[in-house]
Amino acid sequence: PNHPQHLERGSRKLSFGKELWIERSDFAEEPPKGYRRLTLATADKPAMPVRLRHAYVVQATSVEKDSDGKITAVHAEYFAETKSGTDGANSIKTKAAIHWLSVKDALPATIRLYDRLFTVPKPDAGEVDFRELINKNSKTVMQSYVEPSLKDAKPEDRFQFERNGYYVA
């Protein structure tokens, strides 16, 4: 569904495949205390599985890294009996559900994130020229991927990206 509490808002199909995109923050090779998303097993802790929202439970099995040690891929197994909406959906307990995209269907997108324009709450309150108080990092542009249903988005269409906030096309 487009919104689980408002079924009248319709639904869309997402394809599931062997290669998926997840957010980098949804996996930790060395998780901090209290981390509740996808992890590998360690000598003293089992792997932490997660539910892929509206899909299956997955568990990380290994990672690939580039020459700088940055993780470039997470390998995982999925448990076919845990598909959302089936009798076995809750057969493996998880502490989190994460969103994902099929690599095959994901569309590249430019995302613009905006922060405060000024570095102080009241730029006109002092004797400093307001132009000196402009936040040089008030706009961040990054490349990302979005689900295929956004390909027909029109200017000013609004979307909520789960756990991230609201965005305007």
Locations of the language-model features?
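Polyanion-binding catalytic cores of nucleic-acid enzymes and NTP/SAM-utilizing transferases
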Residues: P1-V168
